[in-house]
């Protein structure tokens, strides 16, 4: 049985404070990342927190991309989940580079296959 989807979860450290705190920049980055991976965008929702931080989601026909940013720590958690033949690493790599991540820890989980098994773990 083929996997129903691939879920990339990344911990991004050493990111640029201003980028992590700029909702418009993050929204554009996530929309661009989805399009670069070949996804079809359905909905986009982002929220700016006070005094800082952004959370958001891009819903795609193939699943979703999400972020929670913590500029005061230079940190962002991102998820890119795709179903079908899309490669979620294309979007995740694009996002990490756009945010200026100095360190990145990533796991990729196959989805819809039964018990979770970590397929890969890598760090920048």
Curated annotation (Swiss-Prot):
How does the cofactor attach, per the note? Binds 1 pyruvoyl group covalently per subunit.
**Active site annotation, chain numbering:** 63 (schiff-base intermediate with substrate), 68 (proton acceptor), 83 (proton donor)
What does the PTM comment state? Is synthesized initially as an inactive proenzyme. Formation of the active enzyme involves a self-maturation process in which the active site pyruvoyl group is generated from an internal serine residue via an autocatalytic post-translational modification. Two non-identical subunits are generated from the proenzyme in this reaction, and the pyruvate is formed at the N-terminus of the alpha chain, which is derived from the carboxyl end of the proenzyme.
Q: Look up the EC number in the record and give it.
A: 4.1.1.50
- What top-level class of enzyme does the UniProt entry assign? lyase
Some GO term, biological process aspect, for this entry: which one?
spermidine biosynthetic process
Keywords (A to Z) from UniProt: Autocatalytic cleavage, Decarboxylase, Lyase, Polyamine biosynthesis, Pyruvate, S-adenosyl-L-methionine, Schiff base, Spermidine biosynthesis, Zymogen
Domain of life, source organism: Bacteria
Recorded hits in InterPro entries, A to Z, give: AdoMetDC_C (IPR042286), AdoMetDC_fam_prok (IPR003826), AdoMetDC_N (IPR042284), S-AdoMet_deCO2ase_core (IPR016067), S-AdoMet_deCOase_pro-enz (IPR017716)
Annotated transmembrane regions:
none
List the Pfam families hit by this protein, alphabetically: AdoMet_dc
Single annotated GO MF: adenosylmethionine decarboxylase activity
Indicate the family of this protein: Belongs to the prokaryotic AdoMetDC family. Type 1 subfamily.
Q: What does this protein do?
A: Catalyzes the decarboxylation of S-adenosylmethionine to S-adenosylmethioninamine (dcAdoMet), the propylamine donor required for the synthesis of the polyamines spermine and spermidine from the diamine putrescine.
Protein name from the UniProt record: S-adenosylmethionine decarboxylase proenzyme
Record the organism.
Anoxybacillus flavithermus (strain DSM 21510 / WK1)
């Amino acid at each position: 049985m083929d996997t129903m989807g691939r879920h990339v979860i990344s911990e991004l450290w050493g990111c640029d404070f201003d980028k992590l705190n700029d909702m418009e920049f993050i929204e554009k980055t996530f929309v661009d990342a989805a399009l670069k991976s070949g996804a079809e965008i359905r909905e986009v929702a982002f929220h700016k927190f006070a005094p800082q931080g952004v959370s958001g989601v891009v819903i795609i026909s193939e699943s979703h991309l999400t972020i929670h940013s913590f500029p005061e720590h230079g940190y962002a958690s991102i998820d890119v989940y795709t179903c079908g033949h899309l490669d979620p690493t294309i979007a995740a790599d694009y996002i990490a580079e756009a945010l200026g991540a100095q360190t990145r820890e990533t796991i990729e989980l196959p989805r819809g296959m039964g018990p979770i098994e970590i397929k890969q773990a890598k760090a920048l």
